[in-house]
């Protein structure tokens, strides 16, 4: 399946249905008052996270999503029907942004979580709302309000605890293969990995964490070199970064320069990401005799100015990977789970209620009567005998 992690869609909530101005006898208010019913509310649009989905690809082809408008009210106090809400299913990990205002609307990080993205229009009020004994019509506008319309950017961010960072060919995919059941492609050329991979690591029977392998970064990636830095967004939700450094690059480049290049790109992308705990993992130590490997790793660490959280491994031989995994698990357990901005169902209901109350109050305030002019109303007017 193709991995698509960014799409733009347009969502349109339904307009509120019109309330009806109805009189039983021509231009006269019947006993018991006018009886035009309210319209129905327009349908709202929600995005909901579904753990069974893992791509946004469907929305690349299906960009317009519209909820129905509420139906109009009718005479004899018939209220119009509220339209069904439209629920758009997206993968867990989807971040939502309003393209026009650049406002973040939320993150869907849990299965079933739902966010209101376009509110349906409020229904127009029928004239049955306006009780009066006089032969006068309501000034109240009876049209429903318009449904919200938004252009949204959806981004799928991997939900991983640990992110792998490094140059192409450093051995990131080999590492994820050695510590998890994930089997991404490994090859002796750069840019083997083109899409992110996730693996679940189980250091002990009842403990696990998720690790993300992303395409390699190169110097100048923030200016578009290589595959660019677009994949770094998948590391935004990680709590620890493992910077994989090839101690014996085949191209003869200097591991120290290589490491600085990666850190530089990280800062270019986001200072916040650069602040995350980042451990150094020297890889491919099997290419040297043990003592030489040890001396080389110490030298590189010293030149990088790092003294803590340094590991030397051979991903291919799975040597020294266990202590690393163990320490990662221990650190993760000591960290608070990050709290994401989310809107609960209750909050959505609350907002909706407040909206109703405001609209109802407005109609009370406007509850005066005036000489009625049919042309003021862009609605169907029903006269019944
Ligand atoms: N000798 C040795 N070779 C390794 C080790 N780890 C990875 N390699 C080799 O290095 C090459 C690149 O490995 P990958 O795991 O594909 O590297 P990557 O970082 O995922 O590369 P990209 O996907 O291109 O970013 C492959 O030929 C691997 O077999 C190691 O510990 N020792
Ligand atoms: Mg790879």
Curated annotation (Swiss-Prot):
UniProt cross-references to InterPro entries, sorted A to Z: G_OBG (IPR031167), GTP-bd (IPR006073), GTP-bd_Obg/CgtA (IPR014100), GTP1-OBG_CS (IPR006074), GTP1_OBG_dom (IPR006169), GTP1_OBG_dom_sf (IPR036726), OBG_GTPase (IPR045086), P-loop_NTPase (IPR027417)
Binding site for Mg(2+): 173, 193
Keywords: Cytoplasm, GTP-binding, Hydrolase, Magnesium, Metal-binding, Nucleotide-binding
Domain OBG-type G: residue ranges: 160-333
CDD domains reported for this sequence: Obg
Broad class of enzyme this protein falls into: hydrolase
Alphabetical GO biological process terms: ribosome biogenesis
GO cellular component, one term: cytoplasm
Pfam families per record: GTP1_OBG, MMR_HSR1
GO terms, molecular function: GTP binding; GTPase activity; magnesium ion binding
Cell location: Cytoplasm
PROSITE patterns: G_OBG (PS51710), GTP1_OBG (PS00905), OBG (PS51883)
Residues in Obg domain copies: 1-159
Cofactor(s), names only, from the UniProt record: Mg(2+)
Domain of life: Bacteria
Alphabetical list of Gene3D superfamilies matching this protein: GTP1/OBG domain (2.70.210.12), P-loop containing nucleotide triphosphate hydrolases (3.40.50.300)
This enzyme's EC code(s): 3.6.5.-
Binding-site list for GTP: 166-173, 191-195, 213-216, 283-286, 314-316
Purpose: An essential GTPase which binds GTP, GDP and possibly (p)ppGpp with moderate affinity, with high nucleotide exchange rates and a fairly low GTP hydrolysis rate. Plays a role in control of the cell cycle, stress response, ribosome biogenesis and in those bacteria that undergo differentiation, in morphogenesis control.
Similarity comment: family membership: Belongs to the TRAFAC class OBG-HflX-like GTPase superfamily. OBG GTPase family.
The protein's assembly and partners: Monomer.
PANTHER family hit by this protein: DEVELOPMENTALLY REGULATED GTP-BINDING PROTEIN-RELATED (PTHR11702), MITOCHONDRIAL RIBOSOME-ASSOCIATED GTPASE 2 (PTHR11702:SF31)
NCBIfam families: Obg_CgtA (TIGR02729), PRK12297.1 (NF008955), PRK12299.1 (NF008956)
Protein name: GTPase Obg
This protein's encoding gene: obg
């Amino acid at each position: 399946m193709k991995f698509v992690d960014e799409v733009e869609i347009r969502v349109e909530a339904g307009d509120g249905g019109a309330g009806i101005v109805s009189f039983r006898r021509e231009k006269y208010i019947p006993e018991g008052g006018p009886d035009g019913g309210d319209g129905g509310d327009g349908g709202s649009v929600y995005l909901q996270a579904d753990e069974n989905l893992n791509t946004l690809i469907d929305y690349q082809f299906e960009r317009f999503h519209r909820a129905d408008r509420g139906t109009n009210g009718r005479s004899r106090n018939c209220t119009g029907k509220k339209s069904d809400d439209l629920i758009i299913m997206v993968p867990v990990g989807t971040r939502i942004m309003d393209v026009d205002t650049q406002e973040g609307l939320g993150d869907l990080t849990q299965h079933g979580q739902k966010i209101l993205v376009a509110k349906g229009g409020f229904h127009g009020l029928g004239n049955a709302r306006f009780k009066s004994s006089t032969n006068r019509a309501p000034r109240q506008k009876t049209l429903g309000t318009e449904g919200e319309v938004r252009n949204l950017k959806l981004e799928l961010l991997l939900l991983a605890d640990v992110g792998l960072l490094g140059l192409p060919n450093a051995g990131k995919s080999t590492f994820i293969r050695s510590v998890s059941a994930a089997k991404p492609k490994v090859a002796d050329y750069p840019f083997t990995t083109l899409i992110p991979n996730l693996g679940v690591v189980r250091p002990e029977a009842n403990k696990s964490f998720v690790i993300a392998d992303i395409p390699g970064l190169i110097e100048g990636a923030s200016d578009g070199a290589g595959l660019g830095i677009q994949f770094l967004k998948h590391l935004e939700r990680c709590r620890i970064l493992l910077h994989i450094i090839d101690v014996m690059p085949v191209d003869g480049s200097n591991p120290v320069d290589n490491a600085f290049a990666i850190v530089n790109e990280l800062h270019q992308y986001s200072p916040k990401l650069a602040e995350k705990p980042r451990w150094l993992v020297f890889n491919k130590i099997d290419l040297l005799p043990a003592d030489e490997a040890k001396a080389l790793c110490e030298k590189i660490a010293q030149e990088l100015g790092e003294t803590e959280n340094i590991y030397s491994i051979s991903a291919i031989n799975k040597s020294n990977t266990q202590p690393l995994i163990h320490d990662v698990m221990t650190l993760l357990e000591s960290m608070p789970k990050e709290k994401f901005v989310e809107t609960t169902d209750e909050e959505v209901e609350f907002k909706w209620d407040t909206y109703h109350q405001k609209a109802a109050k407005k109609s009370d305030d406007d509850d005066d009567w005036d000489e009625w002019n049919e042309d003021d109303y862009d609605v169907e007017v029903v006269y019944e005998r």
